[in-house]
Amino acid sequence: MENIIFSPLSSLPSIVEELNPYKIAVLTNDMLKSLWLDKIIELLGGDVFPIVIPDGEEYKTIETAIKIWDELVSFGFTRKSLLIGLGGGVITDIAGFVASTYMRGTLLGFIPTTLLAQVDAAIGGKTGVNFHGKNMIGTFYLPNFVLISTETLSTLPRIELLNGMAEVIKYAILDKNVYRLLQDVKNVEEIRNREDIIRESVNVKVRVVEEDLKESGKRRILNLGHTVGHAIEKLSGYKIKHGFAVSVGLIAAAKLGEKLYNFDSGKVIELVERFNLPTKLPYPPKDIIEAMKLDKKAWYGKIVFVIPVEIGRISIEDVPEELLLQVLGEIR
Protein backbone atom coordinates (compact mmCIF):
# COMPACT_ATOMS: atom_id res chain seq x y z
CA MET A 1 0.00 0.00 0.00
CA GLU A 2 1.14 3.55 -0.55
CA ASN A 3 3.04 5.43 2.13
CA ILE A 4 0.44 7.77 3.70
CA ILE A 5 1.98 10.41 5.94
CA PHE A 6 0.03 12.81 8.17
CA SER A 7 2.53 15.59 8.72
CA PRO A 8 3.18 19.32 8.13
CA LEU A 9 4.36 20.32 4.65
CA SER A 10 7.77 21.06 6.17
CA SER A 11 8.42 17.30 6.27
CA LEU A 12 8.39 17.11 2.44
CA PRO A 13 12.18 17.47 1.91
CA SER A 14 13.01 14.43 4.06
CA ILE A 15 10.27 12.35 2.34
CA VAL A 16 11.62 13.25 -1.12
CA GLU A 17 15.23 12.73 -0.05
CA GLU A 18 14.49 9.07 0.71
CA LEU A 19 13.35 8.54 -2.89
CA ASN A 20 16.51 10.19 -4.27
CA PRO A 21 14.85 11.28 -7.55
CA TYR A 22 16.87 12.25 -10.63
CA LYS A 23 14.56 15.23 -11.28
CA ILE A 24 11.39 16.62 -9.68
CA ALA A 25 8.32 18.03 -11.42
CA VAL A 26 5.27 19.43 -9.62
CA LEU A 27 1.88 19.33 -11.36
CA THR A 28 -0.71 21.79 -10.06
CA ASN A 29 -3.47 24.08 -11.34
CA ASP A 30 -3.57 27.82 -11.89
CA MET A 31 -5.68 28.35 -8.73
CA LEU A 32 -3.15 26.65 -6.45
CA LYS A 33 -0.09 28.15 -8.13
CA SER A 34 -0.24 31.29 -6.01
CA LEU A 35 -1.37 29.49 -2.84
CA TRP A 36 1.02 26.56 -2.44
CA LEU A 37 3.36 26.05 -5.41
CA ASP A 38 5.97 28.62 -4.35
CA LYS A 39 6.09 27.13 -0.84
CA ILE A 40 6.62 23.61 -2.21
CA ILE A 41 9.36 24.78 -4.60
CA GLU A 42 11.05 26.64 -1.73
CA LEU A 43 10.87 23.55 0.52
CA LEU A 44 12.50 21.44 -2.19
CA GLY A 45 15.35 23.89 -2.69
CA GLY A 46 14.15 25.51 -5.89
CA ASP A 47 15.34 22.89 -8.38
CA VAL A 48 11.83 21.91 -9.44
CA PHE A 49 10.02 21.93 -12.79
CA PRO A 50 6.49 23.33 -12.33
CA ILE A 51 3.67 22.25 -14.67
CA VAL A 52 0.48 24.29 -14.35
CA ILE A 53 -2.82 23.23 -15.94
CA PRO A 54 -6.22 24.97 -15.87
CA ASP A 55 -8.48 24.26 -12.90
CA GLY A 56 -11.54 22.06 -13.42
CA GLU A 57 -12.86 18.56 -14.13
CA GLU A 58 -13.36 19.51 -17.80
CA TYR A 59 -9.55 19.65 -18.19
CA LYS A 60 -9.03 16.08 -16.92
CA THR A 61 -8.61 14.78 -20.46
CA ILE A 62 -6.21 12.81 -22.62
CA GLU A 63 -5.34 16.12 -24.35
CA THR A 64 -4.13 17.55 -21.03
CA ALA A 65 -2.16 14.35 -20.35
CA ILE A 66 -0.43 14.69 -23.74
CA LYS A 67 0.58 18.28 -22.90
CA ILE A 68 2.04 17.10 -19.58
CA TRP A 69 3.94 14.24 -21.27
CA ASP A 70 5.35 16.82 -23.73
CA GLU A 71 6.54 19.01 -20.85
CA LEU A 72 8.16 16.04 -19.10
CA VAL A 73 10.04 15.08 -22.27
CA SER A 74 11.31 18.65 -22.71
CA PHE A 75 12.42 18.63 -19.04
CA GLY A 76 14.44 15.43 -19.53
CA PHE A 77 12.22 13.54 -17.08
CA THR A 78 13.20 9.88 -16.55
CA ARG A 79 11.73 6.81 -14.84
CA LYS A 80 13.82 7.68 -11.78
CA SER A 81 12.32 11.18 -11.64
CA LEU A 82 9.51 12.21 -9.29
CA LEU A 83 6.19 13.72 -10.33
CA ILE A 84 4.34 15.38 -7.43
CA GLY A 85 0.62 16.04 -7.81
CA LEU A 86 -0.22 19.15 -5.76
CA GLY A 87 -3.95 19.76 -5.66
CA GLY A 88 -7.38 18.20 -5.50
CA GLY A 89 -8.83 15.10 -7.10
CA VAL A 90 -8.43 16.29 -10.69
CA ILE A 91 -4.70 16.84 -10.14
CA THR A 92 -4.09 13.56 -8.30
CA ASP A 93 -6.09 11.59 -10.90
CA ILE A 94 -4.22 13.03 -13.87
CA ALA A 95 -0.80 13.10 -12.17
CA GLY A 96 -1.22 9.42 -11.34
CA PHE A 97 -2.28 8.62 -14.89
CA VAL A 98 0.66 10.52 -16.40
CA ALA A 99 3.20 8.99 -13.99
CA SER A 100 1.90 5.45 -14.54
CA THR A 101 2.12 5.69 -18.33
CA TYR A 102 5.22 7.86 -18.91
CA MET A 103 8.09 5.43 -19.62
CA ARG A 104 5.79 2.75 -18.09
CA GLY A 105 6.01 4.34 -14.67
CA THR A 106 7.90 7.07 -12.81
CA LEU A 107 8.17 7.95 -9.12
CA LEU A 108 4.95 9.56 -7.90
CA GLY A 109 3.91 11.58 -4.86
CA PHE A 110 0.73 13.37 -3.89
CA ILE A 111 0.13 16.43 -1.75
CA PRO A 112 -3.69 16.54 -1.68
CA THR A 113 -4.90 20.05 -0.86
CA THR A 114 -8.66 19.42 -0.71
CA LEU A 115 -10.74 17.38 1.73
CA LEU A 116 -12.03 15.27 -1.18
CA ALA A 117 -8.52 14.39 -2.33
CA GLN A 118 -7.25 13.74 1.21
CA VAL A 119 -9.95 11.22 2.10
CA ASP A 120 -10.59 9.73 -1.32
CA ALA A 121 -9.02 10.70 -4.65
CA ALA A 122 -5.36 10.56 -3.55
CA ILE A 123 -5.76 7.24 -1.73
CA GLY A 124 -5.89 3.80 -3.29
CA GLY A 125 -4.02 3.98 -6.59
CA LYS A 126 -6.83 4.76 -9.03
CA THR A 127 -5.81 7.15 -11.81
CA GLY A 128 -7.76 8.38 -14.78
CA VAL A 129 -8.92 10.89 -17.35
CA ASN A 130 -12.46 11.47 -18.59
CA PHE A 131 -13.39 10.05 -22.00
CA HIS A 132 -17.08 9.64 -22.92
CA GLY A 133 -17.59 9.36 -19.17
CA LYS A 134 -15.77 9.90 -15.90
CA ASN A 135 -12.37 8.15 -15.56
CA MET A 136 -13.07 5.87 -18.54
CA ILE A 137 -9.34 5.75 -19.36
CA GLY A 138 -7.13 4.97 -16.38
CA THR A 139 -4.76 2.71 -14.50
CA PHE A 140 -4.12 1.36 -11.01
CA TYR A 141 -0.82 2.86 -9.81
CA LEU A 142 0.13 3.42 -6.18
CA PRO A 143 2.08 6.60 -5.35
CA ASN A 144 5.35 6.39 -3.44
CA PHE A 145 3.92 8.78 -0.86
CA VAL A 146 0.81 10.75 0.01
CA LEU A 147 1.54 13.71 2.30
CA ILE A 148 -1.64 14.83 4.08
CA SER A 149 -1.41 18.16 5.88
CA THR A 150 -4.50 19.84 7.31
CA GLU A 151 -2.75 23.21 6.83
CA THR A 152 -3.75 23.06 3.14
CA LEU A 153 -7.42 23.06 4.23
CA SER A 154 -6.94 26.55 5.73
CA THR A 155 -7.22 28.14 2.27
CA LEU A 156 -9.90 25.76 0.96
CA PRO A 157 -13.18 27.51 0.05
CA ARG A 158 -16.23 26.33 2.00
CA ILE A 159 -17.79 24.89 -1.17
CA GLU A 160 -14.78 22.57 -1.57
CA LEU A 161 -15.04 21.47 2.06
CA LEU A 162 -18.66 20.53 1.34
CA ASN A 163 -17.55 18.75 -1.83
CA GLY A 164 -15.32 16.47 0.26
CA MET A 165 -17.82 16.08 3.08
CA ALA A 166 -19.99 13.70 1.03
CA GLU A 167 -17.11 11.21 0.95
CA VAL A 168 -16.65 11.53 4.72
CA ILE A 169 -20.38 10.77 5.15
CA LYS A 170 -19.87 7.74 2.89
CA TYR A 171 -17.19 6.46 5.27
CA ALA A 172 -19.53 7.11 8.21
CA ILE A 173 -22.07 4.74 6.60
CA LEU A 174 -19.34 2.15 5.94
CA ASP A 175 -17.72 2.40 9.37
CA LYS A 176 -19.21 2.85 12.86
CA ASN A 177 -16.11 4.63 14.14
CA VAL A 178 -16.31 7.43 11.55
CA TYR A 179 -20.07 7.65 12.20
CA ARG A 180 -19.37 8.10 15.93
CA LEU A 181 -16.72 10.77 15.34
CA LEU A 182 -19.12 12.78 13.14
CA GLN A 183 -21.76 13.00 15.85
CA ASP A 184 -20.21 16.04 17.54
CA VAL A 185 -19.46 17.94 14.30
CA LYS A 186 -22.03 20.71 13.93
CA ASN A 187 -20.90 22.25 10.63
CA VAL A 188 -18.42 21.66 7.85
CA GLU A 189 -15.99 24.41 8.98
CA GLU A 190 -15.01 22.25 11.98
CA ILE A 191 -13.55 19.63 9.63
CA ARG A 192 -10.58 21.90 8.83
CA ASN A 193 -9.13 21.00 12.23
CA ARG A 194 -10.40 17.44 12.62
CA GLU A 195 -7.41 15.39 11.55
CA ASP A 196 -8.89 12.49 13.56
CA ILE A 197 -11.90 12.28 11.21
CA ILE A 198 -9.72 12.60 8.10
CA ARG A 199 -7.33 9.94 9.41
CA GLU A 200 -10.16 7.51 10.25
CA SER A 201 -11.74 8.06 6.82
CA VAL A 202 -8.41 7.29 5.16
CA ASN A 203 -8.02 4.18 7.35
CA VAL A 204 -11.38 2.83 6.14
CA LYS A 205 -10.33 3.22 2.51
CA VAL A 206 -6.85 1.79 3.09
CA ARG A 207 -8.23 -1.33 4.81
CA VAL A 208 -10.56 -2.01 1.88
CA VAL A 209 -8.00 -1.27 -0.84
CA GLU A 210 -5.36 -3.49 0.78
CA GLU A 211 -7.78 -6.41 0.40
CA ASP A 212 -8.78 -5.57 -3.18
CA LEU A 213 -6.54 -3.16 -5.10
CA LYS A 214 -8.10 -3.67 -8.53
CA GLU A 215 -11.77 -3.60 -7.56
CA SER A 216 -12.62 -7.22 -8.28
CA GLY A 217 -14.64 -7.62 -5.10
CA LYS A 218 -14.69 -5.85 -1.76
CA ARG A 219 -13.35 -2.53 -3.02
CA ARG A 220 -16.67 -1.98 -4.75
CA ILE A 221 -18.18 -0.98 -1.37
CA LEU A 222 -16.27 2.30 -1.79
CA ASN A 223 -18.64 3.07 -4.68
CA LEU A 224 -21.46 3.67 -2.18
CA GLY A 225 -23.42 6.64 -3.54
CA HIS A 226 -21.37 6.74 -6.72
CA THR A 227 -23.65 4.81 -9.09
CA VAL A 228 -26.22 7.61 -9.00
CA GLY A 229 -23.51 10.20 -8.28
CA HIS A 230 -21.53 9.58 -11.47
CA ALA A 231 -24.73 9.58 -13.53
CA ILE A 232 -25.65 13.02 -12.14
CA GLU A 233 -22.14 14.34 -12.85
CA LYS A 234 -22.23 13.02 -16.40
CA LEU A 235 -25.67 14.47 -17.16
CA SER A 236 -24.53 17.85 -15.84
CA GLY A 237 -21.46 17.82 -18.11
CA TYR A 238 -19.45 17.76 -14.85
CA LYS A 239 -20.85 21.15 -13.83
CA ILE A 240 -22.27 19.58 -10.64
CA LYS A 241 -19.46 18.90 -8.16
CA HIS A 242 -18.59 15.30 -7.34
CA GLY A 243 -19.56 15.55 -3.67
CA PHE A 244 -22.86 17.25 -4.46
CA ALA A 245 -23.73 14.41 -6.84
CA VAL A 246 -22.58 11.71 -4.41
CA SER A 247 -24.66 13.14 -1.56
CA VAL A 248 -27.82 12.53 -3.63
CA GLY A 249 -26.46 9.08 -4.48
CA LEU A 250 -26.05 8.32 -0.77
CA ILE A 251 -29.71 9.22 -0.17
CA ALA A 252 -30.76 6.93 -3.05
CA ALA A 253 -28.65 4.07 -1.65
CA ALA A 254 -30.08 4.64 1.85
CA LYS A 255 -33.64 4.54 0.47
CA LEU A 256 -32.86 1.28 -1.35
CA GLY A 257 -31.48 -0.08 1.93
CA GLU A 258 -34.69 0.94 3.67
CA LYS A 259 -36.84 -0.92 1.13
CA LEU A 260 -34.68 -4.05 0.97
CA TYR A 261 -33.25 -4.33 4.51
CA ASN A 262 -35.24 -1.93 6.73
CA PHE A 263 -32.15 0.29 6.94
CA ASP A 264 -32.78 3.52 8.86
CA SER A 265 -32.36 5.97 5.95
CA GLY A 266 -33.00 8.84 8.37
CA LYS A 267 -29.43 8.47 9.69
CA VAL A 268 -28.03 9.27 6.25
CA ILE A 269 -30.57 11.99 5.47
CA GLU A 270 -29.76 13.68 8.81
CA LEU A 271 -26.02 13.74 8.04
CA VAL A 272 -26.50 15.02 4.49
CA GLU A 273 -28.89 17.76 5.68
CA ARG A 274 -26.67 18.71 8.64
CA PHE A 275 -23.90 19.66 6.23
CA ASN A 276 -26.28 21.38 3.78
CA LEU A 277 -25.56 18.97 0.94
CA PRO A 278 -28.08 18.30 -1.86
CA THR A 279 -30.76 15.67 -1.21
CA LYS A 280 -32.88 15.89 -4.38
CA LEU A 281 -32.32 14.29 -7.78
CA PRO A 282 -31.71 17.07 -10.34
CA TYR A 283 -32.64 14.98 -13.42
CA PRO A 284 -35.51 12.62 -14.41
CA PRO A 285 -35.07 9.04 -13.08
CA LYS A 286 -35.10 7.54 -16.61
CA ASP A 287 -32.19 9.80 -17.68
CA ILE A 288 -30.23 8.79 -14.57
CA ILE A 289 -30.77 5.08 -15.32
CA GLU A 290 -29.61 5.47 -18.94
CA ALA A 291 -26.44 7.25 -17.77
CA MET A 292 -25.84 4.51 -15.17
CA LYS A 293 -25.85 1.80 -17.82
CA LEU A 294 -22.74 3.37 -19.40
CA ASP A 295 -20.91 3.57 -16.08
CA LYS A 296 -17.87 1.40 -15.28
CA LYS A 297 -19.82 0.11 -12.29
CA ALA A 298 -22.43 -1.56 -14.54
CA TRP A 299 -21.46 -5.24 -14.60
CA TYR A 300 -22.59 -7.26 -17.64
CA GLY A 301 -25.08 -4.50 -18.43
CA LYS A 302 -26.68 -4.75 -14.98
CA ILE A 303 -26.78 -1.78 -12.64
CA VAL A 304 -24.92 -2.85 -9.51
CA PHE A 305 -25.66 -0.95 -6.31
CA VAL A 306 -23.84 -0.67 -3.01
CA ILE A 307 -26.62 -0.74 -0.41
CA PRO A 308 -26.38 -0.13 3.36
CA VAL A 309 -27.91 -2.88 5.49
CA GLU A 310 -26.97 -1.04 8.70
CA ILE A 311 -24.19 1.40 9.67
CA GLY A 312 -20.99 -0.58 9.08
CA ARG A 313 -22.65 -3.34 7.04
CA ILE A 314 -23.07 -3.25 3.26
CA SER A 315 -24.57 -5.37 0.47
CA ILE A 316 -23.59 -5.27 -3.23
CA GLU A 317 -26.26 -6.41 -5.68
CA ASP A 318 -27.99 -5.61 -8.93
CA VAL A 319 -31.27 -3.79 -8.43
CA PRO A 320 -34.42 -4.27 -10.54
CA GLU A 321 -35.07 -1.25 -12.73
CA GLU A 322 -38.65 -0.85 -11.44
CA LEU A 323 -37.44 -0.53 -7.82
CA LEU A 324 -34.77 1.91 -8.91
CA LEU A 325 -37.31 4.06 -10.76
CA GLN A 326 -39.50 4.07 -7.66
CA VAL A 327 -36.68 5.16 -5.31
CA LEU A 328 -35.33 7.79 -7.72
CA GLY A 329 -38.87 9.12 -8.16
CA GLU A 330 -39.15 9.56 -4.38
CA ILE A 331 -36.09 11.83 -4.26
CA ARG A 332 -36.77 13.77 -7.48
Curated annotation (Swiss-Prot):
It holds the Pfam family DHQ_synthase. It catalyses: 7-phospho-2-dehydro-3-deoxy-D-arabino-heptonate = 3-dehydroquinate + phosphate. Transmembrane segments: none annotated. Its cofactor is NAD(+); Co(2+); Zn(2+). Belongs to the sugar phosphate cyclases superfamily. Dehydroquinate synthase family. NCBIfam families: aroB. This is 3-dehydroquinate synthase. It comes from Pyrococcus abyssi (strain GE5 / Orsay).
